[in-house]
């Protein structure tokens, strides 16, 4: 769990090699980058709010790896973490985001009119479509490091801003601590609410402290636009609906997100952003757009095909189990989404998903007929 600086000072009584974590069995990005020399160089540093190197890496020390996805193994505790510990974060970001260099600049495009097609993904295969991102409010620590007071202030600010949304975005806020166990579980099962904080990544990084204090979900009346408050990020903004109309989902996402940003600005708050990293979020895997456009897609044949992982890789897509990051696929249904977050715009990422999903459906249909798919295997995007 996050420590104060007095604890860090105490640790400096021991030589760096005595404090260096045992990463010999680890398979995450942090463990690939962190050497005893780098640890020695950075361990005495801290951000203005007191976040230290050990706070950054703890989740990756406690969680050696993941069977489906190469985890990042570190978190930021505030906006300054990415700068103070850049010797660690920069190579991790480059590794995780396909060679994204410290000198590269990120691009943003939240104009849904720039998306080609996407309103006709076959609903016989695509069960639901979803676009999400995260946003952090400048001036507050991020969830691994924020205090109870900060968390409550973020909740208050967010609820005030969201209550100003109108039209088809109008809705209400449900605080986690005022929900019954059954209500909570129903929302989780329907994929509307974040899981209880059982994920070891959440626990080891300190994001689950004081749970469920100041956590909750805001959603519009027909549950197609949702905002999670104070889970892994200050805000997670989600647009979702049944079926394959990704264009509609993305349009609602862009409109809602733009309105939320305007509402925060009217209260003199802005989102953490810089030209190099785009939108700043807790996990380095979400930097840039923070955007994950995904579909729940039925691929009973392709899902078992030996070429499936390679096809996804070439399309710059990734698969998760039906229930999310820590789960397996049920009944041939996969959660397929863009693998990238940084170095591509929002529109480009959603376009990759739309185009890729169409090809996956074509392959599935071929396999249903007992035909080969070799000629459909794409080149690397």
Swiss-Prot record:
Query: EC number(s) per UniProt?
Result: 2.7.3.2
Looking up Gene3D superfamilies in the UniProt record yields: ATP:guanido phosphotransferase, N-terminal domain, Glutamine synthetase/guanido kinase, catalytic domain
Catalysed reaction equations from the record: creatine + ATP = N-phosphocreatine + ADP + H(+)
Q: Where is the major localization of this protein?
A: cytoplasm
3'-nitrotyrosine carried by residues: 269
- Positions bearing Phosphoserine: 4, 199
Positions contributing to ATP binding: 128-132, 191, 236, 292, 320-325, 335
Q: Which UniProt keywords apply?
A: ATP-binding, Cell membrane, Cytoplasm, Isopeptide bond, Kinase, Membrane, Mitochondrion, Nitration, Nucleotide-binding, Phosphoprotein, Transferase, Ubl conjugation
The record's subcellular location field reads: Cytoplasm, Cytosol; Mitochondrion; Cell membrane
Any one GO MF annotation of this record? creatine kinase activity
Subunit structure comment from the entry: Dimer of identical or non-identical chains, which can be either B (brain type) or M (muscle type). With MM being the major form in skeletal muscle and myocardium, MB existing in myocardium, and BB existing in many tissues, especially brain. Interacts with SLC12A6 (via C-terminus); the interaction may be required for SLC12A6 potassium-chloride cotransport activity.
Task: Specify the protein name.
Answer: Creatine kinase B-type
Q: Which organism is it from?
A: Canis lupus familiaris (Dog)
Tell me the lineage of the source organism.
Eukaryota, Metazoa, Chordata, Craniata, Vertebrata
Q: Gene name?
A: CKB
């Amino acid at each position: 769990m996050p420590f104060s600086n007095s604890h860090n000072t105490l640790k400096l009584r021991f030589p760096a090699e005595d404090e260096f974590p045992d990463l010999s069995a680890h398979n995450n990005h942090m463990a690939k980058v962190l050497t005893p020399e780098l640890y020695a160089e950075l361990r005495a540093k801290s951000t203005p709010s007191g976040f230290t190197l050990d706070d950054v890496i703890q989740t990756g020390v406690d969680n050696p790896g993941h069977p489906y996805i190469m985890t990042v193994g570190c978190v930021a505790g505030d906006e300054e973490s990415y700068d103070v510990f850049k010797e660690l974060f920069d190579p991790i970001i480059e590794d995780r985001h396909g060679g994204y260099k410290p000198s590269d600049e990120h691009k943003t495009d939240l104009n849904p009119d720039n998306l080609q097609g996407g309103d006709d993904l076959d609903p016989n295969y695509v069960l639901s479509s979803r676009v999400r991102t995260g946003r952090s409010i400048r001036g507050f620590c991020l969830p691994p490091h924020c205090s109870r007071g900060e968390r409550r202030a973020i909740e208050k600010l967010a609820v005030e801003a969201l209550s100003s949304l109108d039209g088809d975005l109008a809705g209400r806020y449900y605080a986690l601590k005022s929900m019954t166990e059954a209500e909570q579980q129903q929302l989780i099962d329907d994929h509307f609410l974040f899981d209880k904080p059982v994920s070891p990544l959440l626990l080891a990084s300190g994001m689950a402290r004081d749970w469920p204090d100041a956590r909750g979900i805001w959603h519009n009346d027909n549950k197609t636009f949702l905002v999670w408050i104070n889970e892994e990020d200050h805000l997670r903004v989600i647009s979702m609906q049944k079926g394959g109309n990704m264009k509609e989902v993305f349009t609602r996402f862009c409109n809602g997100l733009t309105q939320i940003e305007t509402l925060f600005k009217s209260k003199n708050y802005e989102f953490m952003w810089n030209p190099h990293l785009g939108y700043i979020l807790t996990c380095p895997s979400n930097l840039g757009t923070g955007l994950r456009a995904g579909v729940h897609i039925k691929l009973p044949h392709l899902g078992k095909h030996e070429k499936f992982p390679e096809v996804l890789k070439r399309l710059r897509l990734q698969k998760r189990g039906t229930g999310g990051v820590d789960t397996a696929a049920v009944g041939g249904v996969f959660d397929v989404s863009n693998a990238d977050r940084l170095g591509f715009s929002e529109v480009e990422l959603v376009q990759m998903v739309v185009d890729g999903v169409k090809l996956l459906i074509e392959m599935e249909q071929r396999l249903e007929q007992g035909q080969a798919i070799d000629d459909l295997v794409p080149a690397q995007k």
